Amino acid sequence: MARNQSAGRQSATRPAAVKAAKPTVGSKQLGSHGRDIEMFLGQFDALEQRRQIREGMEASIIDRVAKNLLNVPVQTLLAGLGLPSSTILRKIAREERLSPAESDRVARVLYVFRLAMDVFENETLAAKWMQLPHAELAGLRPLEVLDSQPGYDRVRDLLMRVIYGIGA
């Protein structure tokens, strides 16, 4: 009987260990700097993306998105997303995770970047578009309005209008 209880305990702890082993966006487990971004955008389904956001992406994703996707200083990305610089830079230095709210803002940048890539078919053009003021955003840059869901919705709408040939 003790053996069965022991086995039961082992199997009860096993799922937790498996869950802990799942890599999160920004972690070294997913490989090279671009691999985690690529996986989040292209290979993770909506439920896995949700899990990644709720568990918190690794803070290092901020550095990767700023430098490797958008070609902007980290401070520019943080300001655009309305994230506190000192807190996020500390999390990056300590290799900590972002909060779900912080991760959600980063995810919005990734979603918009992917959509901009679909429109412009070029990473450089997509990144530049996200940094240019737009009349339909009251002169703000798309990157500056991704700190809220309504801002994200507006930027997504602009890109969808381009895709479908409706004046933007």
Please tell me what each predicted stretch does.
Residues 1-168:
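Non-transmembrane "mature" sequence context
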